[in-house]
């Protein structure tokens, strides 16, 4: 990547090298816009490169479904469009049902999904067994929800592919540098400040994941963003294919391109930090209604002080400057539930594990789009652990908005200003 001269002027500056920022950089540079992207670590080093790798429409908040359906259409051709391997495989997504209440909820979701033209089916127990031949006979599975058009991809590989393709189209990149401020004048964006230097652009996309709220706060924008530390484990490779992404009651299972299984338990650790007090009122209802969703870690400030650094780097996971240790208890929970449902996996060993910070918002849907009080500023953050699959479509929509085109999906309900 060539050196960047801060005396120049760009059409668009993107803060954040996750899949949202990298896909936006690709679609905009392909359209001929001059793009500069900042990433404080390496591309995909936060949650974009550390998630489970599901690419799904199924079981989403219906406000996200049009985005998810548009994203699937893009994923189907991305390896050709980017001219790179992404580990894309369209094997469908299965959510197991273990009670009559589960079945009722799945039928209700499927009925509404039909109005969107989604191909979701409700499977009987026998049909589930046919799709998952290794399922334990005594697993008490009554049925499942299945969407055949859902798929999977390799998170870090896909994120990097978008950035590399963007660079081929002329995008410029600054890695290892943190943007400290969004600069404005007369109510409009003028650029960003990094390492004391001003980089100029009339349009800026803030896609900085868990760091977005702090950047926006200096402009008076309220974004009550919190972070959850989620853990993923990787097993040794299977000798047989496991084509579907599967959601057990608590554990998600995906087979990676190298044959290994990636496992993750729903929820994670809520690491208490300074912003926890600032945003507490926004999350009281969520924590009361979903106490199992995250475990509060009151000692997290000490973790950063006492730690000697982040866990050792892994070959296929981008390194990060954050100290984000995986939780061994979560790994054990994931292994236990996986082998309960699939006894043939009982001898699989965990080869690696990692964690990443999920940036969340109180209503569990993202903030996407322009900020009316600051001309030229757009936001893409708060994807609450289910943004990876949306990434291509979000990048394309941001590109369309900046070019003055009609966006390919309605994002009016994702306003970054909805929290006041």
Region locations from a protein language model:
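N-terminal Rossmann-like FAD-binding beta1-loop-alpha1 element of flavoenzymes
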Residues: 12-36
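Flavin-dependent oxidoreductases
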Residues: 23, 182-305, 317-328, 333-341, ...
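Glycine-rich phosphate/pyrophosphate-binding beta-alpha loops
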Residues: 52-54, 60, 150-152, 357-359, ...
């Amino acid at each position: 990547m060539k050196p960047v001269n801060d005396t120049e002027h760009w059409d668009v500056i993107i803060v954040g090298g996750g899949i949202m920022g990298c896909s936006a950089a690709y679609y905009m540079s392909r359209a001929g816009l001059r793009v500069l992207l900042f990433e404080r670590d390496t591309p995909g080093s936060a949650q974009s490169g550390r998630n489970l790798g599901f690419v799904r429409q199924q079981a989403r908040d219906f406000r996200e479904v049009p985005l998810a359906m548009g994203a699937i259409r893009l994923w189907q051709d991305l390896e050709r469009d980017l001219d790179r391997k992404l580990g894309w495989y369209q094997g469908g997504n299965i959510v197991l049902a273990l009670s009559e209440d589960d079945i009722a909820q799945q039928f209700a979701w499927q009925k509404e999904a039909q109005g969107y033209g989604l191909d979701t089916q409700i499977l009987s127990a026998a049909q589930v067994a046919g799709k998952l031949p290794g399922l334990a006979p005594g697993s008490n599975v009554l049925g499942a929800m299945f969407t055949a058009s859902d798929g999977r991809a390799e998170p870090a590989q896909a994120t990097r592919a978008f950035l590399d393709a963007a660079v081929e189209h002329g995008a410029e990149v600054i890695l290892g540098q943190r943007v400290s401020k969004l600069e404005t004048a007369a109510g409009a964006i003028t650029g960003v400040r990094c390492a004391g230097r001003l980089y100029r652009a009339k349009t800026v996309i803030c896609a900085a994941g868990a760091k977005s709220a702090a950047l926006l706060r200096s402009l008076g924008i309220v974004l009550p963003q919190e972070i959850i530390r989620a853990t993923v484990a990787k097993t040794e490779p299977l000798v047989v294919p496991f084509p579907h992404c599967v959601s057990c009651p608590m554990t998600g299972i995906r087979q990676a391109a190298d044959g290994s299984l990636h496992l993750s338990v729903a929820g994670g650790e809520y690491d208490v930090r300074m912003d926890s007090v600032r945003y507490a009122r926004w999350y009281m209802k969520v924590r009361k209604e979903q106490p199992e969703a995250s475990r509060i870690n009151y000692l997290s400030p000490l973790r950063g002080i006492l730690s000697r650094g982040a866990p050792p780097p892994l070959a296929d996971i981008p390194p990060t400057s954050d100290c984000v240790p995986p939780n061994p208890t979560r790994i054990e929970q994931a292994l236990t539930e996986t082998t309960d449902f699939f006894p043939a996996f009982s001898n699989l060993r965990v080869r690696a594990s990692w964690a990443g910070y999920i940036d969340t918002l109180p209503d569990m849907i993202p903030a996407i789009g322009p900020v009316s009080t600051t001309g030229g500023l757009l936001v893409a953050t708060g994807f609450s652990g289910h943004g990876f699959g949306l990434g291509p479509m979000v990048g394309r929509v941001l590109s369309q908005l900046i070019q003055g085109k009609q966006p390919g999906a309605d994002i009016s309900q994702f306003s970054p200003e909805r929290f006041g």
